[in-house]
């Protein structure tokens, strides 16, 4: 909210499901001493009525992680012709994980003459940063990506979803069971919505689309991470014994007709004292190039990337349009409306 307002956007409505903030000025969500906005937080169930009445240029959605969870609000926005942009991780490139739902949303958005899209930290640090860097290569044969994050920062559900604190046997049974599936079986499971793959599943699809590559195969394998000494997890309120799973490495491998292979991984685990959030990307070829982003301000970068994408969202064609189809993101020095090219705001 703060980033959008300070870049010249006008806040006209805000919604939440948290009873503690309902009816309060939206400034209380932003910061304790933030100036009053004059906009009160409304219950999420009133979103359709209020949005349909106000018809804002853009709706920012920062709630959930899968497109299925956002189907209702995306549908509301499409119905009323409101452009929608979300930090939902899958929404960055849902064509290879929820193709049927994405196609339905695409049709609804085209009928409503508006655009739906997903952005965030991954849009830039895992996306345009990589493809822009590729412009300095003569030949690329493989792209390696690795993103580390501390599951202690995201609550018990995510920690357990990564197998932190599991026994090796439980990890193999509940998480690594997909390692024994064929590519076709895994694809069917992902597209059924019964299994949510690693963020890199969607990211590889985004990268291939941006680079105009044609995917021939894609698989994911999950492996436990371990530590040589006991580690105490504050989130789990338990000590993880040396050698037991501290989390998970989810490795996505994508092959393309053009001969470029992607091997990307998300490493989510209980960090040892000397570990930190990091992102490393290597372009293998001529020349070989590696870029690293250590200790990134993930939340701030997610919000800033979204706000800087708003003018491009407004200018984009109608439909579910992923950001690989957008121009490269840019830092908006001036008010957001001055970057909109398709109409005067």
Region spans (language model):
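N-terminal Rossmann-like dinucleotide-binding module
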Residues: 1-32
